[in-house]
Amino acid sequence: MTKPIFKSKTKPLGWSKISSKEVINEDEEEEEGGEEGGEEEEIDNNKNSNNSSSNSNNNNNDNNNNNGEERKVEKEEEKEEINHYRNQFEKDLLDMELKALNRETIDNILSGLNSYEIFKEVNFDFEKLYSIIISEPPPLFDTFFDSVSSFEIFFTDCLILLCSNFPDGIDTSITRPNFNDFYNHFKDRGVINKYISRENIHKALNDKLMTDYFNSGIYLGLLDTLDIAAIRFITIFGKFLSYEVVETISNSLFRYRTDKIEFLSDIIRELLLCNEKYRTLSKSYDLVQKRLQKEEFTFIKVFEDDDPKLFSALYQPPDIIKLITEPEKDSGFWCMIGIFKSKRILDYLIRTEPSKSWFKGKESDYFFSIAEMGGKYFNWTLLEPKLIKKEVNQKSLKGVIPPRELNSQQRNTQFFRVFNGVTGFNDIRFVYANPSLAQHAIKFIQKVTECGLFLNTDVRNVRDSIPNSNSFLFRKFLEVNFFYRYEKDNEVYQHQPTEENSLLYSTSIISRIVEMEVTDLLSVVLKNLTQQGCSLAREAVDERSLLSTIHSDKYYNSSIVVLHNYWPIPPKFCDCSTSFISMANGKLPRTYSGSDGVIPYIFFARNHLTLGFLLSIHNNITDTIDINHWISVAISGGLYYDKEEIFRKYPLLQKESTLQKYPRPVNILEFQTLLENNECIEYIARTFIKEIPPHEVPTVKHSDLLILFEISVMKKRSIRSKESLQAELDLIEEEKREKKKQKDKKKNKSNQNQKNNNNQNNQSNNNKINSPSSNKLTQNVTPPSSPVNIITSSSTTSSSTSSTTSSTTSSTIEPKPPTQTLPIKTSSPTKPESQKPSTPDPLIPKSSKSTTKNNNNNNNNNNNNNNNNNNNNNNNNNKENREMALEVINEMEKIEIEESLLSTSSLVQPQQQSQQSQQQQEQQQQQQQQQQQQQQQQQQQQQQQQQQQQQQEKQQEQQEQQESIQLNQTLTPIIPDFQIGKFKFSRDENNIIGRGSNGTLVFRGIWNDRIPVAVKQMQKAFNPHISKEIEVLIRLTSNNCSNMIRYIDQEEDQLFVYLGLTLCEESLQDLMESKRYKEFIEKTTTTNITTTFNNNIIDENLYEQRILSLFKDVINGINFLHCQDIVHNDLNPRNILVHKGNFVISDLGLSKMQVETSYSFTNNAPTGQEGYHPIEVLQEKRKTKSVDIFSLGCILFYLLTNGQHPFGNNKLLRVANIVYDKPDLEPLKFNAPALDLVRLMISQDEKKRPTIDTILNHPLFWSTNEKIKFYESSLNLLKDPNNSQSKHSKLLNYYQNDNSGGVLFLSKPWNQIIDPFLIDHVENNNNNNNNNNNNKQNSKKLAIVAYQYDQVRDLVRCIRNSLVHHKDILRSITQQQNLPPSSKEFANDCLKSQESVLLYFECKFPDLLFHLYQQFKKSDFNSKDYLNIKF
């Protein structure tokens, strides 16, 4: 009989955990006890044998003693062997060597427990059953249990076996029983109740040994035979298992899974449902790669098996709703469905209850999302017919031409059935040169074509995704496991497959596939777009993409050939950018300018096969280009970043482009030579140069090939050798030297002629001024009886090209007979300048002669200096000087002839001639003086203008320096560590003064080394046309608009654009948040009013007026934008900055600008989360100028209420209040004009919102003069007989139209509100004025109309009279002797000006003016005839 292992001396097992050491010690004690018992039995047997056999001898006793010693030795050896096995098993367990476990040992355990009857026999006492089993272990079995087993492990085995019998006797409808069901089922059976409590089970299942046990036991021992038991065990007790245990079970199943285990997905499903941490980590994108490497379970297994059960366990209803409502936020999920074609999971999504509840009224959105995801990953199984119908739109296609048989009217109205869901070409990471996905795309597009649908030719640009833990790591995982990276060899940065480049170079679907170079895919796309007889237009393909493909050094013949079959490739590339055209027109010859600003594609081919194909379709081998033209087009076309990059790659091209003084045409062979492209050079030579055998082409020099190419291909007439070319160069140099010599000679001759002309002019002028008329002619005096010979010689100097001649005319005049002309004598050639003309000395005074010489010498010196200074002038100046010299000479000849005639008459009438000559001299002197005065005046004016300009420039510089000094004093000093162009700034974190969307940063910096600016750094990738838009903003803000932030300058590099803005102190939001807004208003408020009445009210009035003046700054800025047809679209306190005590508008990034490149400055639209956008913006409707009016209304409320918002201060509720039109204007209830204007400006109906002009005409913004005019016009309006009726007069006394049920405007008679002494003098002055007027008109005293103190009309009359006659009233008060000095001083403050009078009545009746304004708006008054107000 087997002894129970637990004796009374041992402590009961209970629920205390039995460690392996305790079990080992108890086993050793039992072994020792067994040995002692065996020895006692042997002794008793010996005694009996001795008694029975009396003839026994002593030898037997000796043998027995020897046998006992041998047995002791054997037992010691067995103990050592047992200890050896025990140590070995413990080592295996510590090293996690699960293969060392004996499968048969565990089978023996299970064979003893497999029967449910054994639990009944022991009355479900687990301790008793545990004692029985371990009391008689098989060989070595005790060592296994001693080192490994514990009561918890045994207890776990029992729970698993009990789960196999759990369905007996309970409701079979329970598919997923829980712990309560298990407990209720077994709680009344034996003593099991004390073992299956929650605490005991939790303690057992979280034991450290459970990990090793489940790693081996579940798979090796249980699952092959007890599949239902294992599933039920996890279902019932899964929530008690720790994450480590659950992960161990999952890894064992996932690592050693076989096809025999059909219930594997059921076990994984139960594990997912029972442990939240395990479920979260299994669907994590961050850990997917790591878990796959460790052969652990991930969500990819779900999509790979297309198992809806596992999917329902992995994704709970909240997850499903999120996937349906926001599919783009979890693109990895839809990517897995698309890659593995998980149609059953998709069907489950459609049929699931959360989806059905969400579908109400939103089926189209869901179907659109599914269709878009299906198109993104080219999965046709995701697109059922009903989903495709939701994606089909009737619209026109860019670049697709309808069949030609249609007439023009039908062709214009032709629409296509377009499928918009193919967005897979947007994501270059998944598609770019990926053969597996390309094959899916081919089949997908073929299905679309079979349905008669057209693909949308427009490809949307993908956005730069900011790397985060989810999307970035998951994309990397997809690249590693499902796609391979593709990078072009020897490609520049612009054409690497990056998302930034897809943003910069937007293209069509055909161009995108041409870049991908997948021929089969391109073929099916072209077939789709040309189905039903359609053809492709020129704009269907982006020529920049085609240019980049042709420029690749690899050859993709099939793609280009396929494209050419459907879309003929043009012979030349044309860049339509304005900068390129302007550059071409300015630098290129006629053959390259204007509309011919194109370059043949053959000059961009770097592969000889590509070049051959292009030459085969267009035989343009004789075309030529200009190198600088090619460089500019290559840069504008996106092939290279700048010239430096081109020159680094092609040094010969740099040398040729820099040496060219004038554009020179270059043929294709010479261009390929400059590129050092040997393959293309050999191809051109073998194909087109027939004089050289093809096999000898590689041996011929490139220079010889160029000569032969010019002769045979370019059709040059003569062969030029090196010697002839050198001789031609020598001749050209000699010709240049000769031309230079001739130019120098001409300059010298012209200078000499100019000197001679100047000398003669000076001499003649001096003779005219200093000598009498007789000295102007050379006379030979003879006696009266003899004739008098008068010889006049005049020398003329010809030009530098003609010879110099002089003619002398001599005339003989007799006194009595008539005058006789002597024969003309031809003089010899002109003498040199050193020789003087032969004139008698006595006829010329010495003084005049000396002065003439001095003047001539001075003039010569001055002329020499002038000539030396003018030697560097152009030939045009010399021509002008020559022409002027000839005119002077002609005039001098005419003067001399006239003087000769005058001299003859002077002999007859000397006195008259002398008088006339004196008059002429005086006149000439006066004219010269006048000319000199005019010249001096002009010089003075020019100097004054220059001085004024210099002063203005100095003033501007001083202002800029003062501004910079002020800003530098208020701001911390800038230590620049980065410079771009004229900008210098520091990229330190402390130097950042603003942040924006898409990585935009604003730094404090310096422009032009002295002016502080704000430098805004923006990424080019988000807006490739940002430079042009900044140019528009710079021109826009330079139009003297002081209420807009100034856009000063821009610079750019490879990644960013840097914009210089006016550096402002802070924003309006900063003022409010720092609680310095009131202090700012008070500091910037200036007033000249000093009063002694109601200073608090005056302070409040001035405070409000300052706020309104600041608000006018914002209105003027918006008015400036609206005049330019620009809507700001993002007005809020953060975009209103403080600059020099005024407000300026900033951040035109969301303005709707009429720019050729784009209509928005950034790609981000306003979200409206801050509550400054109207409902039409929130609903994404058409935006008009009224959007800014709504924002202005919110800002006006914000300013007047110290930072409050008209739709609530809670940002989360503002949007809802705007949508439901629930403003809260309670803070403005005591400011009626502001309340009225704000209510109109924030009206939900955009048509009811006022314009900018209407806002500025509102009474809230009236000046003092406008208010005075309004009172005067109001009185005239009330005097109108049509308005003076009792009905109209009484209407002013009430707030409402109904005078019976309305509220009185005056709470008491208005004479009780005004000071008594003032009303008395106002009445007296009114009576006096009426008497005076009546006496003047009728000379009779008429009845005086007295004031009625309960009528608003009379109050208006009183105010008007006080404004007009305030001086008379003040004089009468000061002359009154009974009044105390304080009253007189008070009256002086109130009546010293119209402004003080108006301020006094506004303090007494603050709502009167606006009350009149509202009443006059009504149709009962004919206010338009009197008031010039736009209501």
Swiss-Prot record:
Gene name as annotated: irlA
GO BP, one annotated term: IRE1-mediated unfolded protein response
GO molecular function, one term: protein serine kinase activity
Name this protein carries in UniProt: Probable serine/threonine-protein kinase irlA
Upper classification of the organism: Eukaryota, Amoebozoa, Evosea, Eumycetozoa, Dictyostelia
Ranges of biased composition (kind: Low complexity): 46-67, 750-776, 792-812, 854-878
Protein keywords: ATP-binding, Coiled coil, Kinase, Nucleotide-binding, Serine/threonine-protein kinase, Transferase
Binding site for ATP: I993, G994, R995, G996, S997, N998, G999, T1000, L1001, K1016
Active site (catalytic residues): D1130 (proton acceptor)
